Amino acid sequence: MGKVAALLLMAAIALAGCSRSGPPPISSGERYVAGQMTDMVYHLGAGDKIRVLVYNEPQLGGDFSVGADGEMSLPLIGNVPVAGKTIKQVSRDVQARLADGYLRDPRVSMEVQTYRPFFILGEVRAAGQYPYLSGLTAMNAIATAQGYTPRAARRTVRIRRFGDQYEQEYVLTPDLRILPGDTIRLTERFF
């Protein structure tokens, strides 16, 4: 009887080791699906490239990059903090700074030219940093990284959203959106 109890105990321990830890994966239908991107507010960050147009002042406009310090250096007014702000907020800030002793009634227009890159690591053939393209999904990102390795888990993906401290596991579906600055990690599957 002692051998049977010991065998059952060992089997229970072995099965407990196979159990999943942590919360279940989030269905991509719950967050960041393709149709919702237009409703989301994009916050600028390091690596973004912004096109600035100042009406009747072409020498003040151009394409400017957001530096690692979260600032963008513009002619005449110098460094402007932009990290964490929307394009509208930055446009208003620049307009106010230009109106403060430089131009009378300045009109400023801005748009994001190039978004910060996304990163993909783990069980893909070519892990690395890639340029973000509007409408990017997790499946597109995996294809950009030359597809899965033979050991890759193909049902879920882990994503750390830009600005978040932790990654979250998502069910891999065709509409799972990737955002600028996201880090995607494909894990190894268990046999």
Which residues does each predicted region cover?
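Sec-dependent bacterial lipoprotein signal peptides
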Residues: M1-A16
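Ser/Thr/Pro/Gly-biased, low-complexity, turn-/loop-rich segments
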Residues: C18-F191
